[in-house]
């Protein structure tokens, strides 16, 4: 049985593979900044995609995607801004925020494109 950290890492790897099979290109994983972390940064047809990966064994407390609340969205936006400052060649490219939620065993992934917008934060 995997511990919480290993389980999260396995779900992130599965999410990355899922997105790559869908045609996205991987740019970075687990990018940490003070106050926030980006699970995956991908590139999709002229867009930088910041991906939050969430996992829930059971949905008794809501779906994994529902756990990306306003506070978490703000942290993701702040981390995305810092990422773009460090990679200025991407700063002029449109960006979006996606969520990949994993649930159950065996793992099932659900990709939510454009899961939230800046004005949702």
Curated annotation (Swiss-Prot):
UniProt xrefs under Pfam families: UPF0102
Domain of life: Bacteria
Matches recorded under InterPro entries: Restrct_endonuc-II-like, tRNA_endonuc-like_dom_sf, UPF0102_YraN-like
Molecular functions per Gene Ontology: nucleic acid binding
PANTHER family assigned to the protein according to its UniProt record, in alphabetical order: UPF0102 PROTEIN YRAN (PTHR34039:SF1)
UniProt xrefs under NCBIfam families: PRK12497.1-3, YraN family protein
UniProt family annotation: Belongs to the UPF0102 family.
HAMAP family, sorted: UPF0102
Name of the protein this chain belongs to: UPF0102 protein PD_1586
